[in-house]
UniProtKB/Swiss-Prot annotation:
Protein name: Transcriptional repressor NrdR
Superkingdom to which the source organism belongs: Bacteria
A GO molecular-function annotation: DNA binding
Residues in ATP-cone domain copies: 49-139
Family of this protein: Belongs to the NrdR family.
Source organism per UniProt: Shewanella pealeana (strain ATCC 700345 / ANG-SQ1)
Zinc finger (unnamed): 3-34
Function: Negatively regulates transcription of bacterial ribonucleotide reductase nrd genes and operons by binding to NrdR-boxes.
One Pfam family here: Zn_ribbon_NrdR
Keyword list, A-Z: ATP-binding, DNA-binding, Metal-binding, Nucleotide-binding, Repressor, Transcription, Transcription regulation, Zinc, Zinc-finger
Cofactor: how bound: Binds 1 zinc ion.
Amino acid sequence: MHCPFCSATDTKVIDSRLVADGHQVRRRRECVQCHERFTTFEGAELVMPRVVKQDGSRQPFDEEKLRGGMLRAVEKRPVSMDQIEQALTKIKSTLRATGEREVKSEMIGNLMMDQLVNLDKVAYIRFASVYRAFEDVSEFGEAIAKLQK
């Protein structure tokens, strides 16, 4: 790895630790030439499947879109960023575990609802009302009744 200070090509690893629940390695490095120290983070580059939309179009998986949907659902609710990140990690792991090159957007929506129902019931109803396109109060009532069972 090149030194970010002097661009020397030789650096040595001083310390390595697992971070992010074992999904990343944090390394402290020292340049052999200028002796400056710096930190690097190493993680596996995992390919996510493409998303098949309801209209049949295909697009790359967009983690920020997934995160944005979850953040809107849990807005002003007692859910920590750690809980959100764990839920997103579970969704992504499940998608990768399918082994498929493409997944339907419906599957992603259902995985999101599975995570939200465990995080916060109000957030689940918020997301479901948009995702399932509730049109009247009775549909909200049905969704709430399912939660209470």
